[in-house]
């Protein structure tokens, strides 16, 4: 079974880590993924630096996923599947914009980040629709 580690290095102490961990474990189990996962909750300023360094994009973003699997479609074999970084500031703003709760938006971002690690992309409208549908299966 995959292990999920969650760390909140943002200044927001109102994050319910247990519900995020449970969701992540459910997704990994459904995909029969054996690799472990790190989820790191960060501030916008931290995310801005990550985004610039690893994607060469300026500004912040809501979620970044980094796969540690050797091959794109390979299953991690008891090793680290990857890391998902989530901007808590972005999650709060998007929750207001989407008329969702903060917890719902964090769960959506966790699902979104993990789905990227599992091979989902959203380069086309069709891909985005497929990914959104899968996210909804988990966050309802």
Predicted regions and their residues:
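An acidic/histidine-cluster motif and surrounding catalytic segment
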Residues: 1-107, 117-140
